[in-house]
Each structure stands twice: as C-alpha cells, then as structure tokens.
C-alpha cells in the first residue's frame, strides 16, 4: 500500500525571514505563489531553480490565493476586505468583490475555484491592527459565512450561514464535493455542490478545524494546524 509521502522524502526549508506566510497556490508552470501578509507582499518560488522572488508589493494584505483557469491569480485581499484578480504578467489587480449587500466583508480568507469556474471563499473575522483608520474591527456582516461567486463573476451569494468561523476551504477535483473547515468550532464539514453553486447534504467530515486545506489526486484531505493532518 502506497504511503502519503514518498519513501526517503525529507522536509526542507525553502526560505526564511518572513513575518507570517499564507496562501500557497501553484500555477500551470509549477511555480508556487504565497503571501507574507504582515509585510503586504506576494512571493513566487520556482522549485526548479529554488529561487524565491518578489511578485507583488502592495498586495492588499492578501491571505488565501488561487489560480483561475485563465492563469490569473485570485487573492483574498484582507486590507479592504475585498476579493482581487491579479494579472500574473503585470501584477495589476482588479477588484472582483468590494462588498456584499452594501457592506464590507469581514475579511475574505481562503478560496477554492470549481472546475466550471465558480468561486467559493470563506469570510471569517480576524481583527487586524492595520485596519486602524480604515474600518472598525467589529463584524461587518451579520455572521461569518461562506460565499459563492458565479463563473461569469456577476452573481455573489452565501452558501453556508451556520458556521462559527469558517477558514480553510477546498473541493474535489471533479467538482462534486466541497470541504469547509470551521476552525472556530473545531470541525470540518463536507457538502455536495449543486449545478447552481449552492451546497446541500452537509455532513461532518472530521472533528478538527483547519487553516489552509488541500486535497490530493487520491482524495486525501490535508488539514493544517498543529502540523499537517491527512484524512482519507
């Protein structure tokens, strides 16, 4: 039976000196993009050359990242509680989601894009010191929810409103199921994804919350917290 980690594999440090890294996302070329949120930067790591270079400064205090099918980078820009689309060639951003129902979001955190292009993101509240003079540190929405942005980017609606503090989010490669970690309730939930983007058949996946999440080609779900925990 094959293990999760290749035999003889060792954990290696790519680079240090960051304040708080977040949101690893890989493009089609295999480059890994990640954020240093307190320093308001996005970096790119090329595994072939093992070089880490600055991709974008003034990154909206981005947290979670995810690449669209067209190669553009989606970022949960926490500074002004927005969702950004960033051109990978120029680094120029476009605001996709500035608000919801006339109010700021709490702070978009993590992102997953389904195969058909629709986008899910979590919106928990983590009061930030850099919000001083920009917005209140209080809740902006009426709770901490999960949202869906349609593939044509014209419709935005909530798909989960009964969670305490949703954070990590990831779906299966076939686009049938979505996992959402409620880190505030120390649980991870599994949903069925409907054609219109709504979620049904909520079931408890495990008694553990998570920050970032990912899934491999065999369907194993990886949760992060005190280390990395893998569930089959």
Q: What does each model-found stretch correspond to?
A:
Residues 1-232:
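Sequence-structural signature of mature extracellular/luminal beta-sheet repeat domains
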């Amino acid at each position: 039976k094959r293990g999760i980690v290749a035999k003889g594999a060792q954990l290696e440090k790519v680079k240090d000196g960051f304040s708080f890294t977040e949101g690893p996302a890989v493009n089609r070329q295999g480059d890994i993009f990640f954020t240093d949120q307190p320093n308001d930067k996005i970096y790119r790591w090329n595994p072939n050359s093992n070089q880490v270079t600055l991709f974008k400064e003034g990154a909206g205090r981005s947290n979670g990242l995810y690449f669209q099918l067209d190669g553009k980078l989606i970022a949960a820009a926490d500074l002004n509680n927005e969702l950004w689309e960033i051109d990978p060639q120029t680094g120029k951003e476009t605001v996709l989601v500035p608000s919801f129902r006339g109010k700021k979001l709490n702070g978009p955190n993590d992102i997953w894009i389904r195969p058909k292009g629709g986008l899910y993101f979590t919106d928990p509240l983590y009061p930030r010191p850099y919000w001083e003079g920009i917005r209140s540190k209080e809740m902006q929405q009426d709770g901490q929810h999960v949202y869906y942005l349609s593939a044509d980017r014209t419709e935005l609606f909530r798909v989960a409103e009964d969670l305490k503090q949703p954070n990590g989010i990831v779906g299966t490669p076939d686009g049938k199921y979505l996992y959402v970690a409620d880190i505030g309730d120390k649980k991870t939930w599994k949903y069925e994804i409907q054609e219109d983007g709504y979620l049904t058949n909520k079931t408890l996946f495990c008694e553990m919350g998570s920050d970032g999440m990912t899934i491999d080609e065999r369907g194993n779900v990886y949760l992060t917290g005190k280390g990395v925990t893998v569930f089959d």
